[in-house]
């Protein structure tokens, strides 16, 4: 087993019983792949597939003019380079985007020519706006903030059949309906009403009989009946009535007359039910016709028009009901044979026939006019308008698009379904197999007549009792629209607007000699893209609290958004967990509240296929043997197979063991024999999402609490010193690396140089391309603000000289420890009540935890101030502020901006700014005098940026932005100078590193080689030595050595060119940077200057902060207790946290107890290792102990592959506690936890005896810190990974004495953001009334609320020292009076 450089240092002991078959895939692949497919930057112009931008252009172009003599054709598109990189965009508040240019060709045809002849072709590039680019971590920078485009789970295009579950009609009758949903275009619905008539609707408008649509498609009554019915032929003669014998139709019927064979024997007596045996007898007797009673013809419908062959008179029309009068007419006219529709109550209903009778339209045109009137009421139905509307509804590619997915879904549901034998022989089978044979193959992305008829036929067949309705919550009927597809739709809608504008101008293209760029205005495209990324419901402000929240946000799928569901209309079924979610969508992670079940998270191994359906991987099973082959199956494909679970028992050869295996088939759990099994899950954690798979012992937690646990991990604030969880699940490394928080090596190499800002790696020769200077430089992110104001800071995790492989950890980020996700801290926890301080889930915590800064977090706030040009003059950022104390001014520099490093508190001035007062408009003379003698202090007011209330911290950065043409102040200039200086140093360092690396390579390459001559009179044929090279005046002289080996000489020349290019690149980069910094900044209109101040705030743990474990066990810190009062162990160690034991049984999250026990074992093992290292035990003893730890049970580790030095380093990294991995659904068993506890605390150890363990080593004796006495009974103590959540009391605590008031009601505003007061509501008033507290009540309702005069008077009284209230009229009464007047009632107050 090969361990990477990082893994060797801290191997996580895994309790997994099953080997990992499939590595956890790249977690952000859905986002990144989707957008890459949209842009297709990797593909050459002619190799681009019809996806994304290419598809959008192809769908709109060519644009043809109204007269047809000019057209615009699309050739290809190119994306330019973005002007600013990602950090610059964030700082400047702009979008990280690249300019899109399309090459467009204008073709003008000759009007005079008899056949289409090209007269002229003009071609050029057209700017089509800017397309936002995705960052390497799958997000977008829009207007300076990182955003995520969430994938949407919507109903797939196609045809769906369902019923109302008996809810519509009081009888509980099932009303069947069908709906054809296109990707773009009108919806077509078909539905039965309670009378079994079939109707259709377009776009949910008024319903009409379905036969109108069929007539509009060109069918007449006879053809309609011919499609939807089998026929019966009756032969009329003087002897009576006979019919053709169809054996299948007789089963279950009652014989109306005696059925006789040819000899006259009775086969079935009259009145008897016909059985299968009777049918066999009838068939064997060779009967072809049956006698029927003439009365049985009554009520039947004619299948076709009956026409008198002699006179040509229509005796009866198709679908006419046979009555006695009609029969008499037939008799008179000598009709010998009539064909009727075969209808029975059981499985051949008269639905279409009855609907046809309610339909009064005659013919195709009348039907189309009826549809036109329904779609466009009030408009005159001209023939042309009627035709155009009908054709554009479903048959025009411009207005209707079923899409590739929709066509595939449609065909599989209608043309390609499996039919029963009875259906094969019926009208339905004939329709699909004969009439519409081949319709599936020719179906494009618009509807055809066959498609509509096949949908109606399938619905009728459903009502007849054949087939099943669709489950709309099945993941085979819901697909994912990812970022690329969503952006493509927006881009297409923008292009469609452009098309309308272009068509108008195309007619003048020739006469005015226009070029393509004159015709196309790209503003609608830019506007559509900007609107989508800036304000769409699916474009969300990225949750960046910690790496997990970032990854989860990018893996989210939402059923909301445009074209999706709304919270109010979504029922229980849509929100519920569906069997097809297995391995695709997490059944646990979803928000609590109104969005529950509508917003979901992808499971760990899930991915989308080409059609947008979610797939999950399975191992193939052949004849009971599990193979290594892995197939990804969609929900529909999965329904065809029998799939075993990942924990099924296998023998050493991979064969399934046991007579029966637990499996899933068609969404049901079954027991199947091994030979029936076709697939098997790849991993036990396949079912859940990333957040849920980070919960150890998830299988022992109640689902509701696991949901809370998964959601709360996303709210964990990164601690100052991240600490890996002692008990993890093994997926922590994947999350840390894939989130791009931790940096991993792009290529293997040797660490050359490390400091806090960068890591330099010299790439291995075999990974560097020939002639390239193989150096990778990793610049680290330092103290940057995240979207949630948490601190993003990367720390090097390597030292100079370390040898790394590709994928090894280079630097840790926020909330990562050694490349593993570390959201909280490992706390020693005791489950016991303690003086009521852990009542109702409160948390009692030791002062030592706060003092050691275990839960201290750094938050970075960004404060902005802008200087505008007002009507009264320009605002000025200055140090010269009226009435500002010396203490305040000391922190400002000469430009009026706070120094970096200054410690500031609430109310301190950060940026001094004055605004001209608006008392008088100045005359030109006064303006001149002002300009000469300077401004008077009285004429400006202080509008400085001050530190907000309740906030204090340290200034860590200041950025000044100045509009083009306005002179920079000294501070702005010094910032630019220092930035350029730092950048130049960086470039020089890089060049030095490149130089050193290049010459090291050259030295290794040419020492010992023969030369044909060189500097310092090197003789021909002499060997190059190290001494010779060292003796040359400059290393650059090495390039003048003429080598005999031509290949080496070429490589030398390549390296020379490469170094020269690097120098030129560095100079170019410096010039670009300089230009960017020195040119003016783009600011909003009217803004002259903007200053951003970044303040780092240290938040220590305090009472009121919310904390939680990973099992949904949340609580609020009630008290931080002095360490000497905390319960302590026999050896004097106090516990860190005391939790309430009553929080466990009712919540049913037992996982936390198992985690505590295993964590306790991890800590004990760490202590044992620490003692061994302090006693300087030999590496052999350490190896033996670690062998017992890693290879006792669970996954075996190959410790023999490690050297003694690596064993000692591994041991020293485990000093604070061992690292365990308990994968979800395959975690540590109780026996394994006991085994670890015994290893950590051996019974023969005197230290262990002192702790007073119980027999199972799960509880110990604790002592009261205040009295020193032992508690009455033993207490469960252990180690749990505990998190501090983003709900910090510092950000919520708020108090007001006076402040702003509402303009209308004159009552104090509410909420911290408005500096509002506490709400005193209706119920609180009742309480004071109940107590009879009249004076308090009066005060609350008047001077403390909205009595304007009263509160002013009260303020005066307090100043004078008179403590009395003069309560007056509350403003709310005046508001009430005004509202009554607005209703037209005159109301006046009479004063007495």
Swiss-Prot record:
Top enzyme category: transferase
Enzyme nomenclature, EC number: 2.7.7.6
Short name of one Pfam family: RNA_pol_Rpb2_2
GO CC term (a single one): DNA-directed RNA polymerase complex
Entry keyword set: Antibiotic resistance, DNA-directed RNA polymerase, Nucleotidyltransferase, Transcription, Transferase
Assembly behavior: The RNAP catalytic core consists of 2 alpha, 1 beta, 1 beta' and 1 omega subunit. When a sigma factor is associated with the core the holoenzyme is formed, which can initiate transcription.
Family assignment from sequence similarity: Belongs to the RNA polymerase beta chain family.
Protein name (database record): DNA-directed RNA polymerase subunit beta
